[in-house]
């Protein structure tokens, strides 16, 4: 469909070819009706597409004469445009939403058939079609008639009213239009809702119960003000409708790419489940809320008591996840997975405990979460289900990871409270607590199920939960830093304890030596200080003490950095350290760079929306915490390579001083108690110890070697404090 400019109506009688009449927009003989799906098409799909910058060529039928396209109507036998579709919806022309979707498909297909694939108009049509498919994916699954088809002739009149009514339906969709009041509805219309109100049959199990006004109350004056039809859709949406795409559905045109190929919405609306549902519904005449989360879950849950500070924080996290800000990748998680509609026949065999954001919100509103950990467990269960069911390269998995990053970042900033240890804002807390929480959620859900299920079901559920745990741990292993820092930290701890004992034995001698050496070094230039620090591994015991005292004297940052990992996190990097970090990042293999980008984007709001493939890193603009996290990750990746140079250099030093040691071995063994490190016969441990306990290159080495995901940071920090104070 090439660019269109003017409607073909009113073409002057010019000799030569003329445009055929435009497609009909009303037909009294053709039965039509108003359904919740058609209302959605009118108020969400058409409205969204109409506002798009690429929509203008499709506003009106193609004017082949004006555009000089003599062969257009020979090639395109069924012209279609958005203006026609819009008018048909306004006139209740369609019987079901599938007819309307067919018109959209015809419009796009005509464009693709007539134009070349490289034409701009084709690219514009593709962009519109992608949005069209995304919106259709969110359409109500069950088609429910809003007005009976009987008063068809008169029923055209309130088309404008019905159009306004549609805005009530859109409460759970991103492009929401406020409901406009009904004006000047003729008295004939006032009886329509009454007719609609009579067939109030049973409501399917998954629909919330609706207060039904009695049929015997048809006061015409009140009805125009209270059009019973408009409020029906929110009731349908709130509980009974399953969103087409949940954790198994991507945003692209492959709506059901996860495990089913054909998009169900085209066939679903035709099913005759709908009969006459509750046409009048329970009518809360309130304009629809503008934000996504308010329309997603029924708001009937009354306040059952104040939320704790942590749960208030969790509630704000949930609201953010449901906000429009994250809608682009959060929408598959808004509603429970409708396995039947999506033809995912094995979904409930694989996923035993489905979870989604609307369920979490319902539980939050009804105060079902005793603490923040229960909330976090449900959120992580939702992501775990997604990772488990879908292949790792699936688009919905990428969306889940994005949304989980949002959650973990916010959850890590939980206000401190003694009871909530995993929620402390240490940088590694999300990762540590993540595994703990998923296991806790598994235990909770398995214990809940134990009371109601049989032994066999319990066993199968336990096996399934273990699989879930395994999937989460696999993901953790890929995302988290390698835990090779832990042994090093333990070793440092032992060495520090040993150091403390040595100090207790020969405290006076050590202090005397330390003072004398400190005075000598204080006179030396900064360059000499650096040289001494580099040679520190070959020096004797008290050089370690001297170095640590120098750091204390020169600036309190070094000693303060022992206090806690959090303080280490914020230590600024020197120019040399940044340069070294840059070199180390360049040494990383390609597959490790993704994590580097992830660390930067998760900690730097200004870079969060940048393209990961083309990100430019300016170390001068990065926060110290980001740089420290990068340093830890890079060191954990390069640790194996680093160990070899460390050991070889240690051997060289041992070889150099071997003869000396042989001659003075007895002397040095006698002085061993006076040494701070107590490692004269082995230079390697001394070097390792110094890199951790007395950082020769500045505070950064301390933070990189002593920071770990284990919970022993406080104990090692306190032991180093005591060693420094002495």
Curated annotation (Swiss-Prot):
Pfam families in UniProt: BET (PF17035), Bromodomain (PF00439)
Lineage of source species: Eukaryota, Metazoa, Chordata, Craniata, Vertebrata
Q: Where is the composition biased (Pro residues)?
A: 14-25
User: Which SMART domains does the annotation name?
Assistant: BROMO (SM00297)
The Gene Ontology terms for molecular function here are: histone H3K18cr reader activity; histone H3K9cr reader activity; histone H3K9me2/3 reader activity; lncRNA binding; lysine-acetylated histone binding; molecular condensate scaffold activity
Q: List the GO terms this entry assigns under cellular component, sorted alphabetically.
A: chromatin; nucleus
In what residue span(s) does the NET domain sit?
563-645
Name the Gene3D superfamilies for this protein. 1.20.1270.220, Bromodomain-like
**Functional summary from the UniProt entry:** Chromatin reader that recognizes and binds acetylated histones, thereby controlling gene expression and remodeling chromatin structures. Recruits transcription factors and coactivators to target gene sites, and activates RNA polymerase II machinery for transcriptional elongation. In vitro, binds acetylated lysine residues on the N-terminus of histone H2A, H2B, H3 and H4.
**Which segments carry the region annotation Acetylated histone H3 binding?**
77-79
Instruction: Give the species this sequence originates from.
Output: Mus musculus
Annotated cross-link Glycyl lysine isopeptide (Lys-Gly) (interchain with G-Cter in SUMO2) - which positions? 413
**Bromo domain sequence ranges:** 33-139, 305-414
What name appears for this protein in its UniProt entry? Bromodomain-containing protein 3
**Locations of Low complexity compositional bias?**
158-172, 247-261, 524-541, 692-726
Q: Which family does it belong to?
A: Belongs to the BET family.
Subunit annotation: Interacts (via bromo domain 1) with GATA1 acetylated at 'Lys-312' and 'Lys-315'. Interacts (via bromo domain 1) with GATA2 acetylated on lysine residues. Interacts (via NET domain) with CHD4 (via KIKL motif). Interacts (via NET domain) with SMARCA4 (via KIKL motif). Interacts (via NET domain) with NSD3 (via KIKL motif).
Q: Where is the major localization of this protein? A: nucleus
The free-text domain remark for this protein reads: The Bromo domains specifically recognize and bind acetylated histones.
On this chain, the residues bearing Phosphoserine are 262, 280, 564
Q: Where in the cell is it found?
A: Nucleus; Chromosome
Chain spans, region Disordered: 1-34, 147-172, 236-308, 418-576, 638-726
- Report keywords, A-Z: Bromodomain, Chromatin regulator, Chromosome, Coiled coil, Isopeptide bond, Nucleus, Phosphoprotein, Repeat, Transcription, Transcription regulation, Ubl conjugation
Q: Where is the composition biased (Basic and acidic residues)?
A: 503-522, 656-674
């Amino acid at each position: 469909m090439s660019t269109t400019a003017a409607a073909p109506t009113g073409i002057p009688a010019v000799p030569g070819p003329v445009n055929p009449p435009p497609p009909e927009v009303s037909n009294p003989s053709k039965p039509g009706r108003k359904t919740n799906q058609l209302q959605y098409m009118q108020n969400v799909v058409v409205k969204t597409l109409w506002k798009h910058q690429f929509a203008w060529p499709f506003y009106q039928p193609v004017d082949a004469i004006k555009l000089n396209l003599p062969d257009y109507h020979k090639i395109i036998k069924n012209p279609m445009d958005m203006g026609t579709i819009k008018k048909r919806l306004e006139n209740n022309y369609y019987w079901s939403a599938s007819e309307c979707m067919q018109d959209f498909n015809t419009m796009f297909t005509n464009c693709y058939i007539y134009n070349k694939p490289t034409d701009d108009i084709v690219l514009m049509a593709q962009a519109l079609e992608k949005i069209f498919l995304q919106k259709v994916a969110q359409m109500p699954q069950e088609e429910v008639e809003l007005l009976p088809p009987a008063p068809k002739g008169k029923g055209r009149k309130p088309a404008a009213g019905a159009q306004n009514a549609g805005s009530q339906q859109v409460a759970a969709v991103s492009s929401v239009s406020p409901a406009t009041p009904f004006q000047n509805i003729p008295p004939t219309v006032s009886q329509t809702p009454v007719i609609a109100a009579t067939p109030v049959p049973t409501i399917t199990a998954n629909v919330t119960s609706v207060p039904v006004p009695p049929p015997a109350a048809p006061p015409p004056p009140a009805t125009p003000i209270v059009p019973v039809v408009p409020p029906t859709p929110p009731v349908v949406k709130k509980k009974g409708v399953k969103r087409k795409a949940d954790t198994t559905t991507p945003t692209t045109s492959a709506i059901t790419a996860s495990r089913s190929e054909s998009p169900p919405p085209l066939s679903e609306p035709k099913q005759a489940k709908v009969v006459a549902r509750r046409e009048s519904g329970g009518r809360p005449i309130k304009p629809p809320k503008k934000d996504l989360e308010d329309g997603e879950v029924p708001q009937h849950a009354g306040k059952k008591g104040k939320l704790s500070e942590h749960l208030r924080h969790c509630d704000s996290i949930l609201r953010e996840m449901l906000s429009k800000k994250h809608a682009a990748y959060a929408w598959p998680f808004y509603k429970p997975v409708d396995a039947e509609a999506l033809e995912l026949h094995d979904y409930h065999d694989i996923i035993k405990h489905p979870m989604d954001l609307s369920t979490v919100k319902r539980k939050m509103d009804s105060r079902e979460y005793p603490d923040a950990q229960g909330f976090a467990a449900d959120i992580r269960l939702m992501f775990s289900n997604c990772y488990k069911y879908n292949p790792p390269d699936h688009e919905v998995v990428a969306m889940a990871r994005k949304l989980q990053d949002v959650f973990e970042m916010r959850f890590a900033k939980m206000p401190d409270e003694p009871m909530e240890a995993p929620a402390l804002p240490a940088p590694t807390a999300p990762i540590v607590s993540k595994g703990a929480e998923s296991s806790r959620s598994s235990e909770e859900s398995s214990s809940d199920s134990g009371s109601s299920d049989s032994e066999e079901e319990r066993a199968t559920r336990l096996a399934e939960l273990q699989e879930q745990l395994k999937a989460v741990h696999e993901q953790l292993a890929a995302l988290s830093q390698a835990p090779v820092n832990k042994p090093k930290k333990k070793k440092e701890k032992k060495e520090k304890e040993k150091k403390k004992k040595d100090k207790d034995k020969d405290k006076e001698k050590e202090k005397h030596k330390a003072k004398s050496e400190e005075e000598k070094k204080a006179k030396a230039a900064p360059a000499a200080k650096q040289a001494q620090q580099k040679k520190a591994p070959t020096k004797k015991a008290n050089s370690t003490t001297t170095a640590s005292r120098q750091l204390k004297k020169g600036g309190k940052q070094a000693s303060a950095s022992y206090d806690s990992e959090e303080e280490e996190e914020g230590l600024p990097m020197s120019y040399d350290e940044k340069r070294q970090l840059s070199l180390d990042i360049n040494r990383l293999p390609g597959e490790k760079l993704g994590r580097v980008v992830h660390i930067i984007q998760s900690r730097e709001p200004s870079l969060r929306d940048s393209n990961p493939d083309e990100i430019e890193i300016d170390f001068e603009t990065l926060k110290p915490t980001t740089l420290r996290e990068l340093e830890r990750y890079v060191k954990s990746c390069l640790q194996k390579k680093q160990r070899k140079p460390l050991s070889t250099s240690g051997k060289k030093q041992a070889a150099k001083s071997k003869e000396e040691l042989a001659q003075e071995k007895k002397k040095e063994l006698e002085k061993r108690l006076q040494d701070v490190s107590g490692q004269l016969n082995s230079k390697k441990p001394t070097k390792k110890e110094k890199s951790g306990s007395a950082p020769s290159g500045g505070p950064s080495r301390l933070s990189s070697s002593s920071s770990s995901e284990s919970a022993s940071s406080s104990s090692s920090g306190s032991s180093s404090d005591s060693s420094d104070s002495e």
